[in-house]
């Protein structure tokens, strides 16, 4: 702990004492890059109600009027959904926006909702087999309901009543500079003493601060931390990553290095994913040499951690639009830039449905790997394997929200992954680690099951989805690079805050996911892990603290499951023999 305290005293002095600067397009991760330009803060605008109404624009007004005239929507649907007073300073683009949760029960309802979303250009926040969360202006609610079947017109609840106010409060919380923990039973906060090691994670950080922090970390721990560039963005920014690990002098003769890759920030607005990747990296770096288990994990494996694979979008979400999702690459429509990075990967790309609609939040581009970010990251990862330096055995793609642990495949439920049994067993182990940290429940399911499924009566299950599901990073790393322990983890919460998760959730979320990473490492080490002493980071209300007040007891409680519940990696079915289309046997890339 002394080591972490010392690190953060230096971090605070370096990062907080200087002027905050922005990372302009084209700036690399080289510590000797030219001086950075001034940070341009977000502008707020006070609005009257008439200004809010007019800010929707003539196109929105015309669209709603035409829809109401064609479908004859009853004015009774124009209920008041938001009545809270607007803060003095707010985000004008979301002046009257709300978030609704539509409860769905059949394929027909999902298909009708998907059509309405496309017609009205709505923003889907989350969707699964039970509900769909949608952001819209409250003036659009009657238009939406008029497009839906009768069964859906009353099957909705209000999640966020005043989105602009929620955005403002998430950026500028009115609370003392004292750490709070989350009361998991009623979502209230209870004060606890400030931990110096949590200072950097007390708030979300802009990209320029994250980059300076990464440079500082590798300069302080050069023996086991490197800063590498895994790709480039449309605006010319490098995509920085930590590469953690300790290689022996005989590394050249040892063959490819087993590597786990953890990424966040595919969708720019999912700030908690970026902070969580940074938290995991910090714990691995600073506990090397202190923790026997973590030292072993960095000696046996390389860890590539990318806080955000979408720096352009992340910067834009800070400077201009907090809820921006895609990258910033131009499309066929000048006023609708951006490609959804998690729909742009080459394996089972299915972007035909959104090809004609660049304004869609799930726009996958015109072709597989149309986004510069996914293409350059794929090239980097593939080249690492071709140089016989890297063998990707694990991949974690962090997102928000909904608290789910998803395993391949995303594109279809009709294809069974060849390592399904071990994928499920490890996923349940990860979920157990999270639950024992903070009592947070994470569901475990196939990534394709975020849809409505119905039984036609003949045993055939039919599925429908509000968004396309192909072209995911999860499927590409699992199938193309054979990273056989690949997961997409959707972090907190379950909809109360959505993408606007308050900063007091950063550390609790980081702790529970870091404990999940320890479970992954324990699993990958196999029998060698049993001889090590494993120490979890206790949560605010961990099982160990409640029952025994001991983190060691918590470790034993969890890892007792390995002998009876978790299979060792050596028990896998032969992966390469199951995957017939081995990309490494193709001429050239064979990846696109």
Swiss-Prot record:
PANTHER family per record: INACTIVE METALLOCARBOXYPEPTIDASE ECM14 (PTHR11705:SF147), PROTEASE FAMILY M14 CARBOXYPEPTIDASE A,B (PTHR11705)
GO molecular function: zinc ion binding
Pfam families according to UniProt: Peptidase_M14
Biological processes per GO annotation: cell wall organization; proteolysis
Domain Peptidase M14 intervals: 203-524
Localization terms from the record: Vacuole; Secreted
Family: Belongs to the peptidase M14 family.
Biological role: Inactive carboxypeptidase that may play a role in cell wall organization and biogenesis.
GO cellular component: extracellular region; vacuole
Binding site for substrate: 267-270, 325, 342-343, 400-401
Organism, as annotated: Talaromyces stipitatus (strain ATCC 10500 / CBS 375.48 / QM 6759 / NRRL 1006)
Gene3D superfamilies named among the record's database cross-references: Zn peptidases (3.40.630.10)
Prosequence residues removed at maturation: 23-175
Protein name: Inactive metallocarboxypeptidase ecm14
Record's keyword terms, sorted: Cell wall biogenesis/degradation, Disulfide bond, Glycoprotein, Metal-binding, Secreted, Signal, Vacuole, Zinc
Signal peptide: 1-22
SMART domains documented for this protein: Zn_pept
Amino-acid positions noted as binding Zn(2+) in the UniProt annotation, renumbered to this chain: 267, 270, 399
Cofactor note: Binds 1 zinc ion per subunit.
Disulfide bonds: 336-359
Gene name of this polypeptide: ecm14
Obligatory cofactor(s): Zn(2+)
Glycosylation sites: 383, 548
Highest taxon of source: Eukaryota
């Amino acid at each position: 702990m002394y080591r972490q305290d010392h690190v953060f005293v230096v971090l605070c002095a370096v990062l907080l004492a200087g002027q905050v600067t922005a990372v302009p397009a084209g700036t690399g991760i080289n510590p000797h890059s030219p001086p950075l330009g001034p940070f341009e803060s977000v502008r707020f605008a006070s609005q009257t109600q008439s200004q809010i109404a007019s800010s929707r624009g003539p196109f929105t007004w015309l669209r709603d009027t035409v829809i109401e005239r064609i479908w004859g929507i009853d004015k009774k649907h124009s209920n008041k959904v938001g009545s809270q007073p607007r803060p003095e300073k707010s985000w004008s683009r979301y002046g009257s926006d709300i978030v609704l949760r539509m409860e769905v029960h059949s394929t027909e309802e999902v298909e009708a909702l998907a059509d309405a979303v496309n017609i009205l250009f709505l923003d889907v926040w989350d969707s699964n087999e039970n509900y769909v969360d949608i952001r819209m202006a409250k003036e659009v609610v009657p238009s939406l309901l008029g497009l839906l079947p009768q069964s859906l017109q009353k099957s909705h609840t209000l999640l966020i009543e005043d989105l602009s106010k929620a955005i403002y409060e998430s950026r500028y919380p009115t609370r003392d500079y004292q750490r709070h923990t989350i009361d998991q039973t009623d979502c209230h906060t209870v004060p606890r003493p400030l931990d110096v090691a949590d200072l950097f994670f007390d708030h979300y950080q802009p990209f320029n601060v994250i980059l300076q922090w990464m440079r500082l970390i590798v300069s302080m721990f050069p023996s086991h931390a490197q800063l590498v560039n895994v790709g480039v963005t449309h605006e010319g920014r490098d995509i920085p990553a930590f590469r953690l690990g300790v290689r022996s002098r005989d590394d050249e003769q040892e063959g490819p290095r087993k590597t786990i890759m953890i990424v966040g920030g595919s969708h720019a607005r999912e700030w908690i994913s970026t902070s969580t990747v940074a938290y995991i990296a910090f714990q691995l770096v600073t506990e090397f040499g202190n923790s026997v288990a973590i030292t072993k994990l960095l000696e046996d494996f390389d860890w590539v951690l990318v806080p955000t694979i979408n720096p352009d979008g992340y910067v834009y979400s800070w400077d201009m639009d907090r809820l921006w999702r895609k990258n910033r690459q131009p499309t066929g429509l000048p006023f609708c830039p951006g490609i959804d990075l998690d729909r742009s990967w080459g394996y089972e790309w299915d972007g035909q449905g959104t090809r004609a609609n660049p304004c869609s939040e799930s726009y996958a581009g015109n072709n597989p790997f149309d986004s510069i970010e996914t293409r350059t990251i794929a090239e980097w990862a593939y080249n690492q394997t071709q140089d016989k330096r890297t063998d990707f055995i694990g991949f974690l793609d962090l997102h928000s929200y909904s608290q789910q642990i998803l395993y391949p495949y995303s594109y279809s439920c009709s294809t069974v992954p060849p390592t399904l049994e071990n994928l499920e067993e490890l996923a349940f182990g990860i979920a157990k680690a999270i639950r024992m940290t903070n009592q947070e429940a994470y569901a475990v399911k196939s990534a394709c099951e975020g849809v409505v499924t119905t039984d036609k009566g003949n045993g055939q299950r039919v599925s429908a989805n509000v968004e396309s599901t192909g072209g995911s990073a999860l499927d590409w790393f699992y199938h193309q690079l054979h990273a056989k322990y690949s997961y997409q983890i959707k972090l907190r919460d379950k909809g109360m805050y959505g993408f606007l998760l308050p900063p007091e959730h950063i550390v609790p979320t980081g702790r529970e996911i870091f404990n999940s990473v320890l479970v992954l490492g324990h699993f990958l080490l196999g029998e060698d892990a049993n001889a090590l002493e494993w120490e979890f980071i206790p949560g605010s209300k961990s099982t160990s603290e409640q029952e025994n007040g001991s983190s060691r007891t918590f470790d034993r409680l969890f890892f007792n499951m390995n002998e009876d519940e978790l299979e060792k990696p050596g028990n896998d079915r032969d992966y390469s023999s199951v995957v017939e289309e081995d990309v490494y046997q193709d001429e050239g890339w064979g990846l696109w």
